[in-house]
């Protein structure tokens, strides 16, 4: 007993306390907000000042061009700024979720998957000029699309929680009813702009994706209700409302594929199936490979890459117990059985294939500064694809050999969500727009 205690030299920080890293991330976000307000106010108080001019040049103009005339591309200033803010938000939000006691469930990340697809479909509809470039279209241009999605997610999560809490025994049924209402709300908001591009009588409209796709989403929301009992009310609401919203945006994509606008010529579905299918097969094989090791850790009450409660990472590295040996030996394989880790890897592979195929075979251009540099160095877009597959392997390596303290379980999930936002979301957008030739 004395030997074991000698290995535990530090007590983990309480969940209610913020670490230096978390306070530093909050400072970066606060600084960004102050600079943003200063740039906006500076237009009126001191026209022509360097802060306001830089804000217009590096942030506003690219966004305006992107929403009105097409891909404007990023620049080094906004690339660094967005990256720094993204990492800071990941750290701060994970700390906030830990402090208020939200359970760090893998299912929470899976519940956000429909919203990643929702954002990708919305961006493609914006690329196809279905939304007003000077109005709603701006909401589907990066980086504003991320805040747009966040508003939907936060509001739906809040409403789902409150509906369930106030409804008693039939709260879950009320959450499904809420999801139906939210689907209809999205239909009312987005359908007028999507549907105005095709002239149809009522019979043609009922037989077209403009009606059939949202109706299919409505049916699916109702049909999956019994299978969501294992989820929290927030997760259920996000899944159902997100799926419904995906079908609302899917109607625009389907119409552009069936009845193209502006002399576009959609391609066959083979590139789409190749880009989304090959990574899926790889991840399916990896998932099967990791199941036995993951089950062994679960039987012991352990989770891959998570240090047991009450131990710091520093103390864990000094351990030599049977628990330490089992976790360290099984984690590299068990990680492969984690759906959320595989989703992060899948997103990187899809993004790599979509970019490579789109640039090499269909004449698209790369808008990200770092990605274009990789392509220039490699001499081919397939070099970027190879790098993305390498990043997928690095994601496995990170979660196989890095160790997260028990209090940092939220951070682990937010890191995976961040990887989905910068990997799967743009990858899906690229392959969906490539299929439409937009």
Feature locations, PLM:
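Charge-biased, low-complexity intrinsically disordered regions
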Residues: 2-438
